[in-house]
Design a protein with these regions (language model features):
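N-terminal Rossmann-like NAD(P) cofactor-binding module of classical short-chain dehydrogenase/reductase
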Residues: 82
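Conserved active-site "lid/cap" helical segment
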Residues: 1-79
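Conserved catalytic cysteine-centered active-site region
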Residues: 40-58, 85-106
Length: 106
């Protein structure tokens, strides 16, 4: 006997999207204001540049719109939104509420 009834519907990923802030700060940029160098940072972290700016909500909305477009679905057909971050825009209301509104979800 199966653990999940045949009529139960599972979750699936049918689209995905990405977003990065446009502003880029390189290691050379950092070395102009800090006692460091591109080589020192690369050797220890492997980082060459970082994208900075933009809110968690705005980047989530941008990537969410791309995912919805890729999936070819109506945003109102989405039953759940899961947003996990260590960098929320604020604690209350939750960033997920802003993303839900920005994507036009129920």
């Amino acid at each position: 006997m199966p653990l999940i009834p045949k009529q139960a519907v599972g979750a699936k990923i049918v689209g995905w999207g990405t977003a990065l802030p446009e502003k880029i700060i390189t290691n050379d940029d950092l070395s102009k204001t800090m006692d460091t160098s591109d080589a020192w940072i690369r050797e220890r972290t492997g980082i060459e540049r970082r994208h900075v700016g933009g809110s968690t909500a705005s980047l989530s909305i941008e990537s969410g719109r791309k995912a919805i477009e890729m999936a070819g679905i109506d945003p109102l057909s989405i039953d759940a939104l899961v947003l996990s971050t260590t960098t929320p825009d604020r604690t209350v209301p939750a960033t997920s509420a802003a993303v839900q509104h920005g994507l036009g979800l129920r």
